Regions:
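Phosphate-binding site of ATP-dependent enzymes
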Residues: 1-96
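C-terminal active-site "lid" helix and adjoining low-complexity regulatory extension at the edge
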Residues: 79-80, 94-98, 107-157
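Hydrophobic residue at the +6 position relative to the catalytic HRD Asp in the kinase catalytic loop
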Residues: 103-105
Length: 157
């Protein structure tokens, strides 16, 4: 229990087909989606290179985040979610006032319903994007950031 006597109760939901889906949103628009395949006994669902710990100590000083030979990531594949799921992810991001990031969901094995369980205000773009999703999302991200940086600031006094 927290100092204010609040508590968070979590329930484990088994993911149908042993996978979760991450939808990336950029500027309120669908960028791409991937399915992350779950490994038995693991909970690390991050598709980026730097997220998966190994049994051996690692030095990240010499590790490139775009190294295609790394084993420090969960197995992923491109995915095309239904339009309604994409719209749900867009609405979640808009309601959260997040312009760049991802929404993760799973289909529950027991009831077949989708559960949105993670909202990320920072994109962990998939490693090897051209191979996985067919394009490199970083130029789109850079263009978006530059366009936002060039917008005049609204100052309220």
């Amino acid at each position: 229990m927290g100092m204010d006597q609040s508590a968070i109760l979590q329930e484990y939901l088994e993911a149908k087909d042993n996978r979760i889906i991450r939808i990336e949103i950029l500027g309120g628009e669908f960028l791409y989606a991937i399915q992350v395949f779950l490994s038995s006994g693991e909970f690390n669902l991050c598709p980026a290179d730097y997220c998966k710990p190994s049994d051996e100590p690692q030095s990240f000083n010499n590790t490139r985040l775009d190294d295609p030979n790394t084993t420090n990531r969960a197995p992923v594949a491109s995915f095309n979610p239904p339009d309604q799921i994409i719209e749900n992810a867009r609405r979640i991001m808009t309601a959260s006032n997040i312009e760049v990031g991802g929404v993760e969901y799973l289909i529950n094995e027991s009831d077949g319903l989708e559960y949105y369980y993670d909202i990320n205000a920072l994109s962990n773009f998939v490693a090897n994007p051209i191979e996985i999703v067919g394009f490199d999302p970083f130029p789109s991200l850079v263009d978006f950031v530059v366009s936002r940086a060039n917008e005049p600031l609204a100052v309220t006094l």
